[in-house]
Amino acid sequence: MPVLGALLAVAALAYGGAALAGYGTGELSIPGGGATTLLRAAVFATLAVHLGELAGARIAGPGPLPHPWGRGAALLGAAACFGQIAVLAQVSRLDLMAAYSTREGGLLLATANGFALAAAAAGPRRPAWAVAPLALVVVAEAWRAHPEAYTPEYGAALTVVHLTAASLWVGGLLYVLRTLRLRPDGDGRWRMFTRYARLAGWLYAALAATGLCSTLRRLPADVVFSTAYGRVLMAKLLLMAVVSAYALAAHRRLRRHRDPDGAAAPARAELVALAAVVAVSAVLTVVPDPHWLSLR
């Protein structure tokens, strides 16, 4: 029940976040914004589950592994992409074939195809074959997120790194926590958790650097609190502060007490906070470009 409640809260945040953030800004509401945000959050979550599973299996090392979720996640991600195309067709008053021919529709179709190929490759013998189609998903989503006329290639490159690092962090943590329940050996559990914590430190640095560059590039300083984009970004930063606190608490217990069970409690709270970050990140991709209201 707590897990279901957390998922429902995250879904509600994704669905209503864009409208809430845009209240009083004077910006136009986004047609179909709630449904688009919810579906985009599903894309981010399923990408994280699959990429995190591929990385987590290497981090876990020898021993029992949890049941793979990669194929199901990839199929759900493909369905979420097709759902976005349907919403695009409805709000634009286009038929599906016409929606496919638009820039966003074509990139969503490429993303869906990447997920479908990843699902086909996610067999028990060679699961790493899913890496290439998942890379297609990341690149297509990065290009879709940057339709602006000003140097979109720089924004897309930053998003590729940011989305990959975020997916490995969230999905890797989920996989490690699932594996932890199957491993009775305390020392082996500690080594697995330590390997993940080391990787997470590098991923955090990549996220911080790309996030800062993207913010400086996309958000003019004079509209930080007067646009939906600025407000959502501030909310994301606050959530990341919460995530950082939980991550540090887990790392401290691992380092000082070599206690994987004690570290698991703040790590689970970190995962819940990261789920909220995923939802807020999806909202960030839907709200209007803040440059329209900037005086600069």
Say what each PLM segment does:
Residues M1-R296:
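Polytopic transmembrane helical bundles with strong interfacial aromatic enrichment
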